[in-house]
């Protein structure tokens, strides 16, 4: 039944915004589409555009190097550029984030740099109009789909969980729940209720959540059968493609209606559409309680797909990334329900601590590999959609070059720390600074492409 759900409490607030397009002043340069100078005479021609979403802080600086030194010298692609740096999101009242998602729907492929999600400290630092929501959350709620995160395996990088001998892919449901919730602060005694008003005009339903004796906090969140079904189909299809078993984790023993709906929809879709293919591939699907699943993951050898609700996927993907070596070695791709629209991004944040060092003029050793893989996964998908084998080969070659560079002993400090311990590593003996590492990848890529 369609309808309108609202949260009622003793405290309410209204907010509005006006769209403006004043250019933002950034601490680092703003990078519009760059002139095509000094590029190779014969570049791979890409017929259709790719949406580029720029970001913040250290990753923004690295992103520019990747684009200008690793991608555009070899690939002739039209980039539909959107500056998602926090100052520009503030200048445009976050309209630029919405526009970038709509452009992704139009062109089917986007690559995204890491961005800041502001908290109170960031609001003060950037003098923001308001505490803007997560750009990733906004984009994902427009596009729908599932975020699949998988580790990049380098043979010489030891795992914190040595038993993980095979990759573990997390499928994160990128819609609703906490990321599209309405939350608020209660500053006095009062009743918090949820009210659902059916669209067909029938009587409203009301639930009493809590009778506040004093201040506190409240939240209302939602998800939809359509989105959960799309999530399920994506996960089952991905498991069949990988020939790995699939596990769905929820807390349906506590959230009997909410999480129970996830469990029921997955089971119905599996029984109706995928059980035969799973049996044929000798793989299986199971539902697990989230706490039981976390324990099982630590004891496993890997080699499975883990379907997580939105918040669980956000948290557990970072744990897996560190367990496999580093957040800098984790791919992240949002796959939409239509099967052709994707948005590829780095799984980590903007590396603020390194950016503060950069602002002081000090060299950093920041791992760019996840950001490089955002570009390669996006370009590879563009190649698959367009039937462009040269573009696919280029993306795969750049990925292999990154892995082989690390396996040859050239790496950033975070990876060297996995091998030797962070307190024991020395610059130029065990690791390279950011610029030198990127230059090494560039030289190795040129060599692999036969351009040296």
Curated annotation (Swiss-Prot):
This is Isocitrate dehydrogenase [NADP], mitochondrial. Keywords: Acetylation, Glyoxylate bypass, Magnesium, Manganese, Metal-binding, Mitochondrion, NADP, Oxidoreductase, Transit peptide, Tricarboxylic acid cycle. One of its GO terms (molecular function) is NAD binding. It is found in: Mitochondrion. The modification N6-succinyllysine is found at residues 80, 106, 166, 180, 193, 256, 282, 384. Belongs to the isocitrate and isopropylmalate dehydrogenases family. NCBIfam families: nadp_idh_euk (TIGR00127), PRK08299.1 (NF006156). It is an enzyme of class 1 (oxidoreductase). D-threo-isocitrate binds at residues 117, 134-140, 149, 172. It comes from Rattus norvegicus (Rat). GO terms for cellular component: cytosol; mitochondrion; peroxisome. Plays a role in intermediary metabolism and energy production. It may tightly associate or interact with the pyruvate dehydrogenase complex. Its EC number is 1.1.1.42. NADP(+) binds at residues 115-117, 122, 299, 349-354, 367. Residues 1-39 form a transit peptide. The modification N6-acetyllysine is found at residues 45, 48, 67, 69, 80, 106, 155, 166, 180, 193, 199, 256, 263, 272, 275, 280, 282, 384, 400, 413, 442. Homodimer. Mn(2+) binds at residues 291, 314.
